[in-house]
Regions:
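Forkhead-associated
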Residues: 2-65
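A short, sequence-level motif marking secondary-structure junctions
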Residues: 24-26, 47-52, 68-71, 143-151, ...
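Mid-length scaffold segments of soluble, non-membrane domains
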Residues: 26, 32-35, 124-166
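Short strand-coil-strand connectors
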Residues: 42, 59, 134-138, 158, ...
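Surface-exposed beta-loop interaction hotspot
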Residues: 61, 65-123
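Beta-strand-rich interaction surfaces with strong enrichment in secreted/lumenal proteins
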Residues: 62-63, 90, 130, 171-177
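Extended, aromatic/histidine-rich regions of cofactor-dependent oxidoreductases associated
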Residues: 92, 162-164, 183-185, 189-227
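Intrinsically disordered, low-complexity Ser/Thr/Gly-rich stretches
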Residues: 144-146, 156-160, 167-178, 187, ...
Length: 227
């Protein structure tokens, strides 16, 4: 589940009288309080920044706070949920060295791009540079987002397979460092589905216009087929 918090008190629990109804939960689980960009539960801070948050466990439920732009939400997971029970793995395209490509990194210092997520919300994100590569003699570019380190990048991309064999909202790809010649390896064999391929309660970023490629990339994960 995904529940957007309002400023102040937000009641949670299994009863319909709560602001947010949790499945298989006690009638009342208390109040989640949003105040001054911090979130409190049972008089304790459970969120103060993206790297300082708590995961609350209550029977089969696990929940925590996420922030998207200036909005806060409860992300709820049920370890006994139907989505997990129905999950039977993900199909992949056969690995193909054609789709392990060296890309030229073109820095774009100070550039910000507008990201729209699957819920329709938008926010600004730093774009450290462009990744330029060739396939069958044609040149393509992808806007790179920040990765785990300053030399890693995170890419959200779409391609022509989104209409057939891969998830319609695009896929994710991580890069790891620079090659000795200064290039960056794009290994599309490692392209993977975003969380929103599996659940309607995710807030995945969608590919920017620049990152909607016209070519088909039959590599990496196929559509999970569960959502």
């Amino acid at each position: 589940g995904l529940f957007w918090l309002k400023e102040g008190e937000n009641t949670i629990g299994g009863a319909e009288s709560n602001d947010f109804v949790f499945p298989h939960a006690e009638a009342s689980l208390g109040k989640v309080i949003l105040k001054n960009n911090q979130v409190f539960y049972n008089n304790e801070v459970i969120y103060s920044s993206d790297d300082k948050f708590s995961v609350i466990s209550q029977q089969s439920l696990r929940w925590f706070i996420i922030k998207r732009g200036d909005k806060f939400a409860i992300r709820l997971r049920d370890l006994e949920g139907e989505y997990l029970k129905a999950f039977h793995g993900i199909d992949h395209f056969p690995a193909d060295s054609k789709w392990k490509i060296k890309a030229k990194f073109i820095p774009t210092v100070g550039k910000k791009v507008t990201i729209i997520d699957i819920t329709g919300r938008s926010y600004q994100e730093d774009s450290p540079g462009l990744l330029e590569f060739q396939v069958d003699g044609k040149t393509y570019r992808l806007e790179a987002g920040p990765g785990e380190t300053k030399e890693d990048f995170f890419v959200v991309f779409g391609d022509a397979t989104n209409k057939t064999s891969t998830y319609g909202g695009g896929r994710f790809l991580d890069t790891k460092g620079f090659n000795p010649d200064g290039t960056v390896t794009l290994d599309f064999n490692k392209a993977y589905n975003p969380p929103c391929a599996f659940t309607p309660f995710a807030t995945c970023p969608l590919p920017t216009k620049e990152n909607k490629l016209t070519l088909a990339i039959p590599a990496g994960e196929k559509n999970a087929g569960h959502h």
